[in-house]
């Protein structure tokens, strides 16, 4: 489930997912649709997917807000145990849902490390040093096993 179609953030996240899927031939994407970053649009989209009768093993969302919109849909359909829900951002609500088992996982993006690296690169540029055009700060998959480390 994507964010708003055409937005840079949606494109970046989906591009990363697509790169992983290319290396995963056993994974079949059954549905893709825009949940527009929130539960309000995510819930009816998930309802439509479930109503199709197609087999769904997981719903992977571009953020925790959409994932949290999917959770009650699965509960009311009695599918919480069969269909795993994944989010991104490791919000407080998302982390609580992982801890309770409502979500299988979320991805922690270290914004502080990103900002620190951006300022480091800025200082290097100001000093006349060459910097890479892109730098990736590692993300962490947060599951039931490590969620307590990320909860506030």
List the model feature ranges, each with a label:
Residues 1-152:
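A residue-level marker of the well-folded mature domains of exported/periplasmic proteins
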């Amino acid at each position: 489930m994507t964010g708003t179609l055409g937005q840079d953030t949606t494109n970046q996240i989906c591009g990363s997912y697509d790169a992983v899927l290319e290396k995963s031939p056993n994974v079949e994407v059954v549905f893709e649709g825009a949940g527009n970053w929130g539960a309000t649009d995510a819930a009816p989209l998930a309802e439509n997917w479930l109503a199709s009768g197609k087999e769904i093993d997981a719903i992977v969302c571009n953020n925790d807000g959409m994932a949290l919109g999917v959770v009650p849909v699965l509960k009311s359909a009695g599918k919480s145990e069969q269909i795993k829900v994944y989010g991104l951002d490791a919000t407080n609500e998302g982390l609580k849902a992982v801890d309770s088992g409502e979500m299988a996982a979320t991805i922690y993006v270290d914004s502080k490390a990103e900002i620190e690296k951006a300022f480091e690169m800025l200082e290097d540029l100001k000093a006349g040093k060459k910097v890479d055009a892109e730098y990736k700060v590692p993300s962490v998959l947060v599951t039931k096993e490590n969620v307590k480390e990320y909860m506030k």
